[in-house]
């Protein structure tokens, strides 16, 4: 029984609760839900390290200066975010919270200075040591309903403010860069759109087959060079950030049962938990989705592809279902992703 006399939650119920918070982007609540429970068994650290595969860092590229106009717009976005911070969100590795940063809004000069710092960090206009210290995150191991782990990075408040500033300022550019087949970023009610569109397609053509794909550890495995190249082509306004944030090794920390933090290094992918990561991942995936769509249309003109981050669904005539499956798997492998065969489904 629970301390209050009620029934204790099972591990599966706890995992479902945390997973629901994650799906609603309530990372702070998910983290709080985890840390109040008993720590995971030993061996979690090794499992987490294995989920951050090594890879080559992007080659250095020159990035032009940010115009005064764009800088002013970014500062305005940062000021807004400093004034409406989320309450009781979990802190990053250095213990700083949004409430600490929110206090600067009580003084106009401090407010402006803090916004300038957020923008400088977003554009990489600070020392390498400062970047490294504030790009790192606390890693939490959230257990999925199937018993496997999901690594969640709870970054510094400065990083989260900078990421949200970039998302706010580049909202339309990000939406266009993600492409027409991505429904998780820049789309209002994107999940509902996918569901209703697929329902309509299958009602109109009941002989079609729906194939669902899920990529294993997708955020942590996409090559950073691929992301950088995609951003340069599709959303060049984000290049200063991507060059500064992804061109060096990121060091995260995991606190186990003791009080000592163990480092976890990342040289591939983007951090699941950073507000900018879904956009960067989706931009990196956009060209692959376009190629999948063209490949499917070559098999059957009525074919369609839909993506909700790394969850990909295709609707094709049953006669070309096997060929469509092969085309999707090969294309995703080409961008460094591995389809989880155990989660592949057809109906």
What kind of feature is each model-predicted range?
Residues 1-13, 17-22, 52, 64-284:
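Conserved pre-catalytic core of RNA-dependent polymerases
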Residues 8-32, 38-57:
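Extended, charge-enriched "interface" segments that sit outside catalytic cores
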Residues 57-65:
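Short, contiguous pre-domain boundary segments
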Residues 211, 307-308:
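Residue-level marker for buried hydrophobic side chains located in beta-strands
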Residues 237-244, 304-306, 316-347:
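Polymerase palm active-site segment centered on the conserved acidic dipeptide of motif C
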Residues 282-295:
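Short amphipathic alpha-helix segments
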Residues 294-305:
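Short helix/loop segment immediately N-terminal to the Walker
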Residues 311-315:
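Short beta-strand->loop micro-motif that forms the acidic, two-metal-ion catalytic signature
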